[in-house]
Amino acid sequence: MDAILEILDPYVFDYGYAYLFPQQTTQPSYGNSTGFAPSSASKNFDDEYSLNFGSSLPRDDIYRQSASILMIAGFGAAFIYVISAALSYYFVFDRRLEHHPRFLKNQIKQEIQSSFFAIPIIDLLTLPFFLGEVRGHSLLYTNIDEYGWSWLAISTILYMVFNDLGIYWIHRLEHHPSIYKYVHKPHHKWIVPTPWAAIAFHPVDGYVQSVPYHVFVYLCPMQKHLYMFLFVCVQIWTILIHDGDMITGHWLERFINSPAHHTLHHMYFTCNYGQYFTWADNYWGSHRAPMPELDPIHEAIRVMQEKGLADKDGNPIEKSKSE
């Protein structure tokens, strides 16, 4: 998050905070007296700005940082969600699944509403993690030479394994009867999910499943730009595994927790808890391999054929405008 602040502070937030909370001074000032704490991204920033603008909230003010983080996290999550889910829905998701008997009325609208309800609450709950990163309490670092190029690869692997293991057990525990109905059940409202359901869950559910992503950089050093890249990839991956794609038979199925695996999780509840890989499900006996006959599209096509909406091969029948 500090990497994003270093970009947005001098070009966006400095102006905004100077307008909303102007520095109480009548004399031109330079350097740190402008009210801004120095940052690596602004060392070469135009001195004319420092002469004419200033805010009573310096860049290292915890309240300013908190507000900035919430704006970045909220807008960023919404942007990634809308763009990724839209692309997945319109170009990958099989729209015939909307005829499945377990597909809810107005489901997509409900998924989107649930997602936008959850986003700001999750952002607020995760604020302490982001704030700790910005204020230097994590093990994020800037200079690659500090740990070497090989550590980029090693830390990436560790990050994915740590997250996969953590989320597996968090997810599995959420299915315990004493927890499920209070926290995780809202997400399983979508038996036949669309990409819009990726973050359509109880805010506490979204928060606890995100904890491993945040905790990792407090336990293990990671280059901050790599961390931000992987963090964004995680959000996109979460959307992709909700695309309902039941492509089966690929050798990678043995290792990757694919959309097919997660589709089965939504349908059968007690299998495929992993996030990226299948190793945890295999080891702890909760793996269910995707099989062509388990594809929910078969039931959806059957319903469509009964209603005269699909031909014998399952292809949608285009109705004329006169009908």
From Swiss-Prot:
A motif (Histidine box-3) lies at residues 262-266. Keywords: Endoplasmic reticulum, Lipid biosynthesis, Lipid metabolism, Membrane, Oxidoreductase, Steroid biosynthesis, Steroid metabolism, Sterol biosynthesis, Sterol metabolism, Transmembrane, Transmembrane helix. It catalyses: episterol + 2 Fe(II)-[cytochrome b5] + O2 + 2 H(+) = 5-dehydroepisterol + 2 Fe(III)-[cytochrome b5] + 2 H2O. The chain crosses the membrane at residues 67-87, 112-132, 150-170. A motif (Histidine box-1) lies at residues 171-175. It is found in: Endoplasmic reticulum membrane. One of its GO terms (biological process) is sterol biosynthetic process. Its main location: endoplasmic reticulum. It is a multi-pass membrane protein. The keyword Endoplasmic reticulum applies. Its EC number is 1.14.19.20. Disruption phenotype: Leads to a severe decrease in ergosterol production and virulence when ERG3A is also deleted. Results in increased production of deoxynivalenol (DON). A motif (Histidine box-2) lies at residues 184-188. Residues 157-285 form the Fatty acid hydroxylase domain. InterPro entries: Fatty_acid_hydroxylase, Sterol_Desaturase_Related. GO terms for molecular function: iron ion binding; oxidoreductase activity. Belongs to the sterol desaturase family. The third module or late pathway involves the ergosterol synthesis itself through consecutive reactions that mainly occur in the endoplasmic reticulum (ER) membrane. Firstly, the squalene synthase ERG9 catalyzes the condensation of 2 farnesyl pyrophosphate moieties to form squalene, which is the precursor of all steroids. The histidine box domains may contain the active site and/or be involved in metal ion binding. In Fusarium, the biosynthesis pathway of the sterol precursors leading to the prevalent sterol ergosterol differs from yeast. The ringsystem of lanosterol in S.cerevisiae is firstly demethylised in three enzymatic steps leading to the intermediate zymosterol and secondly a methyl group is added to zymosterol by the sterol 24-C-methyltransferase to form fecosterol. In Fusarium, lanosterol is firstly transmethylated by the sterol 24-C-methyltransferase leading to the intermediate eburicol and secondly demethylated in three steps to form fecosterol. This is Delta(7)-sterol 5(6)-desaturase ERG3B. The gene is ERG3B.
